[in-house]
């Protein structure tokens, strides 16, 4: 149990606006601060922080309370975990009663998983920097990619030795329980019940939670064997749900808020290289298709997303439909393409920070206008295909909740599509009426007692 004098010191040092501001974009309004709810999907801010009272109130979800309550609700911390997080942030030493220290095994399930993934991150990082195998294979790979010592340390990059039980054996020896090694995905169970290392011979990319704790890993093989998967990622667990996580967000959130823009890239190396170049407002969806939950995470800090694509035209076209949900969440989307043979990682390494920024500034294009352009080129002179393109573009515009913004896009698209603006507006209104009718029917069906 944390002692009362320690709790008092933590609460005295804590600035509720500063802490909540790490998770929610707050704006001053009179004596209070307001922002969009992190607990509910809303477009009009109803989340309020009162620095004078030291409390928050979220009118969307009904939640409210102290900064400790906020952390417990948002990050699912226990009361002691929330206090320890604040203590770490403000450099306060935590004093606990002897009984609490002696009963570490009573820590809850979630915390036990966090502890074992944190231990693994330290093991892999030390294996990278302090073993001959790690230095000659893992570290040389990271250095070849141009990553500095500061980047390697900041992102806690690591290496998993190419042995069956290097990590598992050490973890068991140090008292970590088999159930948590297996559940976290760090170790895999054989038919005979023994465990072996999941990430043998891979460079390791720890994935951090919103508050900076390691919750999962991505492991990349350096072997050329095509039968070996290039990446192995942590399975879903109580602490890791990949649809709710963006790689690099913990390190990017401050810059995203300051720049009022988030660069979205594809892979770990893209994040690391761009961040290292001083452009820190960058995250990756970690190999998964972008989810609504990830979009809402970004939306806490900015309404502007710039998606950075490499030159793979097929991949770009496949992702276009998925981006409509960004519009549906009320965010603004721009697209930047890199030349064939380049991705954000290679481009920033070859042309530097200034060249990278210039390329983005010169080539960024609004998503809907870009989508119109790419689909029109594909349709050519075929009138049937062109009609399909028109419907698809209007469907995208219909997702935009802001009617004024939608009208502006209709005007732009009518010029690009060479079709009367009134025809597009008519189609837009039909789609919106159909959606409103469908939503109304769904609401009624949910209210009818079974």
Question: Which stretches of residues belong to each language-model region?
Answer:
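Conserved phosphate/pyrophosphate-binding and hydrolysis machinery centered on Walker-type P-loop NTPases
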Residues: 10-13, 103-113, 132-136, 157-164, ...
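Structured, non-catalytic alpha/beta "coupling" segments that mediate domain-domain communication
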Residues: 73-92, 202-221, 345-350, 354-358, ...
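Conserved active-site segments centered on acidic
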Residues: 81-133
């Amino acid at each position: 149990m944390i002692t009362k004098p320690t709790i008092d010191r933590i609460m005295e040092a804590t600035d509720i606006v500063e802490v909540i501001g790490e998770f929610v974009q707050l704006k001053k309004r009179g004596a209070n601060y307001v922002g969009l709810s992190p607990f509910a999907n809303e477009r009009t801010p109803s989340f309020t922080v009162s620095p004078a009272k030291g409390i928050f109130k979220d009118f969307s979800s009904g939640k409210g309370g102290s900064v400790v309550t906020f952390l417990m609700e948002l990050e699912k911390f226990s009361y002691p975990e929330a206090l320890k997080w604040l203590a770490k942030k403000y450099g306060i030493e935590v004093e606990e009663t002897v009984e609490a220290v002696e009963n570490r095994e009573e820590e809850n399930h979630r915390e036990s998983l966090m502890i074992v993934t944190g231990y693994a991150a330290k093991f892999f990082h030390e294996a990278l920097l302090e073993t001959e195998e790690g230095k000659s294979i893992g570290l040389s790979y990271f250095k070849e990619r141009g990553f500095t010592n500061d980047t390697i340390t900041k992102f806690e990059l690591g290496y998993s030795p190419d042995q069956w039980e290097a990590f598992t054996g050490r973890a068991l020896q140090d008292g970590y329980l088999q159930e948590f090694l297996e559940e976290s995905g760090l170790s895999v169970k054989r038919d005979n019940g023994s465990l072996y290392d999941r990430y043998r011979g891979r460079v390791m990319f720890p994935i951090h939670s919103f508050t900076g704790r390691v919750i999962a890993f991505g492991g990349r093989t350096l072997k050329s064997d095509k039968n070996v998967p290039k990446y192995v990622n942590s399975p879903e667990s109580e602490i890791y749900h990949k649809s709710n996580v963006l790689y690099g967000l913990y390190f990017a959130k401050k810059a995203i808020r300051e720049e009022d823009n988030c660069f979205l890239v594809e892979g770990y190396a893209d994040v690391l290289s761009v961040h290292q170049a001083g452009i820190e407002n960058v995250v990756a969806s970690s190999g998964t298709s972008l989810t609504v939950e990830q979009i809402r995470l970004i939306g806490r800090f900015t309404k502007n997303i710039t998606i950075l694509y490499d030159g793979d035209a097929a991949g770009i076209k496949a992702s276009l439909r998925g981006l409509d949900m960004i519009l549906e969440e009320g965010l603004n989307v721009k697209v930047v393409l890199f030349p064939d043979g380049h991705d954000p990682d290679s481009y920033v390494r070859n042309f530097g920070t200034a060249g990278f920024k210039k390329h983005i500034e010169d080539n960024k294009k609004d998503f809907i206008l870009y989508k119109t352009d790419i689909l029109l080129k594909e349709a050519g002179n075929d009138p049937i295909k062109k009609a399909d393109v028109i419907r698809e573009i209007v469907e995208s515009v219909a997702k935009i909740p802001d009617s004024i913004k939608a009208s502006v896009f209709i005007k732009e698209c009518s010029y690009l599509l060479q079709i009367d603006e009134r025809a597009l507006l008519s189609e837009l209104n039909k789609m919106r009426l159909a959606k409103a009718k469908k939503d109304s029917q769904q609401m009624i069906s949910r209210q009818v007692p079974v």
